[in-house]
Amino acid sequence: MAARTVAVAAALAVLLIFAASSATVAMAGRPTPTTSLDEEAAQAAAQSEIGGGCKEGEGEEECLARRTLTAHTDYIYTQQHHN
């Protein structure tokens, strides 16, 4: 009876060690991202608003054309991140 108890305790210890080591290995393979895609998109939008403003002496149509081109280009290059 004592031998069986020791064997069960040893088996449980081995399983516990195996479970603890596999959890550590699984977490090591998945580093946490430093920024999310939403944060990157927000930063890009803020940057384009800063640089996308109308310049002095520029007509409203030219400004609108530049903003539209910027928006379309941004959509084209960020489309793959959303699919």
From Swiss-Prot:
The modification Sulfotyrosine is found at residues 75, 77. Residues 29-74, 80-83 form a propeptide. Pfam families: PSK (PF06404). Keywords: Developmental protein, Differentiation, Growth factor, Secreted, Signal, Sulfation. It is found in: Secreted. The keyword Signal applies. One of its GO terms (cellular component) is extracellular region. GO terms for biological process: cell differentiation; cell population proliferation. Residues 1-28 form the signal peptide. InterPro entries: Phytosulfokine. GO terms for molecular function: growth factor activity. The keyword Transcription does not apply. Sulfation is important for activity and for the binding to a putative membrane receptor. PSK-alpha is produced by endopeptidase digestion. PSK-beta is produced from PSK-alpha by exopeptidase digestion. Promotes plant cell differentiation, organogenesis and somatic embryogenesis as well as cell proliferation. Belongs to the phytosulfokine family. PANTHER family: PHYTOSULFOKINES 3, PHYTOSULFOKINES 4. This is Phytosulfokines 4.
